[in-house]
């Protein structure tokens, strides 16, 4: 089975110049843990809930609520995104993608074709496919 058969094709993305608070809002409201970051049409990085947590200096300093929100409005996505992103092709074998996620200890892989983001595959997508293959009602 190929990655293109399992990946999510409609992917929420962020621009490198978006405020960090936007990433927080999208992740919280959409229950999303990973967001690819684009610069035009080119994949520039990725940001995860873990990255947001690490960058929330206001929380680390004991501030909460509005102070944390104000800090997130001053930071840009490009300030905290992971720039060295492991990617795969839509034609990659699903087993190879799973092995790569396990080896790198990452929860998702952006799917790129001709330097353009075409999808995203996550641990959840793989588990859902497994359930389908087992004949489970989803």
Explain the meaning of each model-derived region:
Residues 17, 46, 71-74, 91, ...:
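Non-catalytic, surface-exposed connector residues within folded enzymatic/regulatory domains
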Residues 1-10, 49-85, 98-102, 122-138:
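Tandem CBS (Bateman) regulatory domains
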Residues 27, 35-51, 101, 109-125:
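A glycine-centered beta-loop-beta connector
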Residues 19-23, 44-48, 62-68, 93-96:
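Short, functional N-terminal and low-complexity linear motifs
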Residues 14-31, 37-38, 87-105, 112, ...:
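The conserved cystathionine-beta-synthase
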Residues 34-35, 41-42, 63-66, 73-75, ...:
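Short, surface-exposed, polar/charged, turn-prone segments marking secondary-structure boundaries
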